[in-house]
């Protein structure tokens, strides 16, 4: 099998892992609190990745450690939003709303760095706003709490992307080592928060053990390894389009595994949001969306 085809199939599989993560996160809530679950997940991923990339870690610079710590702290905000968002909204909504960082990122760059976005951003934002309203407002005129939390998660993702983009552009920063440090810092912060605000405990039932291990091994650890080793074998635009499939996969998982059924209006909204993501990715975020799931 050609390297490009194999790489793209593995990246599609990785996207599937991320899509299923929303469902398994909700399953884990029956026995684990949110902070404890994230600590378990990220520390497991760190201890999986550290031996794989030990050569990178041995030779990493001070700048690499510094930026790994900064991005790891920001990633905590991302996953606080993602985890609690899943808890208080539908899996389908969480999947679509949490992926909006690809559109939010250029807005952050415009505000913070005065970097002019592409002209099609306005069209993408309009489509996305209409789609978000159709998806989330239902029969009322306000967001559910979980929808708002997921939107805050997307904003945090946007900040994570911008910071990561600036960090890896520095010649003294090793992106792989930085990402492993990032995951370790995220796990350590979540563990500290869990001891402060929760009563950390390990899963009790085999079902929850399986779900938690899947999140750590496949959705965080293995997914990162696949992304960093395989995306170089295909075009960045194709990688971005593959990752745009995540909200669609999330909706399919929610339909078949969780039995979620959306109003036809919500499906129209989801389609508009998906189209806005594709519009942005056709020749836009070569780095944007590649970075949005870095280490997740």
Language model region names:
Residues 1-36, 73, 140-166, 188, ...:
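Glycine-/small-residue-enriched transmembrane alpha-helix faces in small-molecule transporters
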Residues 4, 9, 41-43, 50, ...:
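C-terminal-most transmembrane helix of multi-pass membrane proteins
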Residues 48-58, 82, 101-123, 248-268:
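C-terminal transmembrane-helix exit sites in multi-pass transporters
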Residues 20, 24-27, 31, 44-61, ...:
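Membrane-interface helix-cap regions at the ends of transmembrane helices
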Residues 38-40, 94-100, 164-187, 220-256:
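Helix-helix packing/entry segments at the starts of transmembrane helices
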Residues 49, 69-70, 75, 117-137, ...:
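Hydrophobic transmembrane alpha-helices of multi-pass small-molecule transport proteins
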Residues 17-22, 50-98, 106, 134, ...:
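Specific transmembrane alpha-helical segments of multi-pass solute transporters/efflux pumps
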Residues 46-49, 105-106, 142-200, 212, ...:
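Transmembrane alpha-helical segments that form core, pore/gating elements
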């Amino acid at each position: 099998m050609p390297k490009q085809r194999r790489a793209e199939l593995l990246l599609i599989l990785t996207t599937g892992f991320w899509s299923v993560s929303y469902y398994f996160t909700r399953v884990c809530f029956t026995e684990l609190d949110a902070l404890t679950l994230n600590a378990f997940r990220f520390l497991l991923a760190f201890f999986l990745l550290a031996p794989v990339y030990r050569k990178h870690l041995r030779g990493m610079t001070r700048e690499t450690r510094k930026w790994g710590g900064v991005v790891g702290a920001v990633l905590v905000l991302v996953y606080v939003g993602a985890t609690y968002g899943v808890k208080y909204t539908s899996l389908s909504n969480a999947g679509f709303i949490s992926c909006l960082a690809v559109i939010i990122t250029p807005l952050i760059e415009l505000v913070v760095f005065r970097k002019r976005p592409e002209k099609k951003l306005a069209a993408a934002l309009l489509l996305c706003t209409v789609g978000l309203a159709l998806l989330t407002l239902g029969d009322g005129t306000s967001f559910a709490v979980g929808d708002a939390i997921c939107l805050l998660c997307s904003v945090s993702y946007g900040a994570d992307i911008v910071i990561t983009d600036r960090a890896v552009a520095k010649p003294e920063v090793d992106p792989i080592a930085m990402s492993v440090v990032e995951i370790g810092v995220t796990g350590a912060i979540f563990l500290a928060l869990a001891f402060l605000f929760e009563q950390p405990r390990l899963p009790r039932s085999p079902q929850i053990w399986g779900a938690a291990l899947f999140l750590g091994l496949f959705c965080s650890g293995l997914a990162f390894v696949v992304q960093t080793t395989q995306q170089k074998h295909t075009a960045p635009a194709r990688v971005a389009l593959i990752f745009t499939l995540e909200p669609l996969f999330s909706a399919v998982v929610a339909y078949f595994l969780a039995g979620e059924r959306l109003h036809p209006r919500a499906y129209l909204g989801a389609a508009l949001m998906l189209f806005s993501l594709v519009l942005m990715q056709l020749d836009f975020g070569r780095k944007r969306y590649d970075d949005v799931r870095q280490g997740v």
